Design a protein with these regions (language model features):
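Thiamine diphosphate
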Residues: 17-202
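Active-site or pore-adjacent capping/gating segments
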Residues: 1-15
Length: 202
């Protein structure tokens, strides 16, 4: 109430960044980055294998976004076979509505689910930036560390070929300025798989 608030201590300046992020169990790299006698994989397959392993082990995980469900499995085929393996309730398509794709992670996380979502191309993320900035990135801070939104937002960028002015943007320098989110930009298939799995447990 109001009187109780008046008697509360002033915020401590040292606590300003206390709840930018929830504590993480991932503090160091484990395992072999490129195991011997294993065939090298392309980035797309590394993404597929990482998501498949996560979904097999964690029933609370979901994958959704533009064209990731059903038979297509993403425009780069990084979700191929996942809908057939895990069903349409866990791998599904969404409308072409990035604000919904990103914003829905807040509600999904609130009920104990852990969404992995995809914005089809980096250029498309701008309509979802409001949800990313005002809801997802601030969730842990605004709840005093009690309710962090836990999700992975996949944003394909720098893929093979070129896609003209609406499919070729590099957005990482803008996103990296948002406090409360972590950006991973893998350069190898091993990095992609490791970072994806680390992000899930973070």
């Amino acid at each position: 109430d109001y009187k109780k608030a008046l008697k509360a201590e002033d915020p401590n300046p040292e606590d300003l960044f206390l709840h930018d992020f929830a504590p993480t169990p991932i503090l160091e790299e484990k395992g072999e980055r490129a195991p011997k006698n294993k065939e090298a994989t392309v980035m797309v397959d590394s993404a597929l294998f990482a998501i498949k392993e996560i979904m097999a082990e964690h029933p609370e995980s979901l994958l959704y976004g533009q064209d990731v469900g059903k038979r297509l499995g993403g425009v780069f085929r990084e979700a191929a076979t996942l809908a057939q393996t895990f069903g349409d309730n866990r791998v599904f398509n969404t409308p072409i509505q990035e604000a919904f794709i990103i914003g829905s992670t807040v509600g999904m996380s609130a009920v104990g689910l852990k969404p992995i979502v995809e914005v089809q191309f980096a250029d498309y993320i701008w309509p979802g930036l409001n949800q990313l900035f005002t809801e997802v990135s601030r969730s842990n801070y605004l709840s005093n560390g009690k309710w962090p939104v836990s999700c992975i937002i996949r944003v394909p960028i720098g893929a093979y070929g070129s896609g003209g002015p609406y499919h070729s943007s590099s957005v990482e320098s803008v996103l990296a300025q948002i406090r409360g989110i972590k950006i991973a930009y893998p350069s190898t298939g091993a990095d992609l798989k490791g970072l994806m799995k680390s992000a899930y447990y973070d």
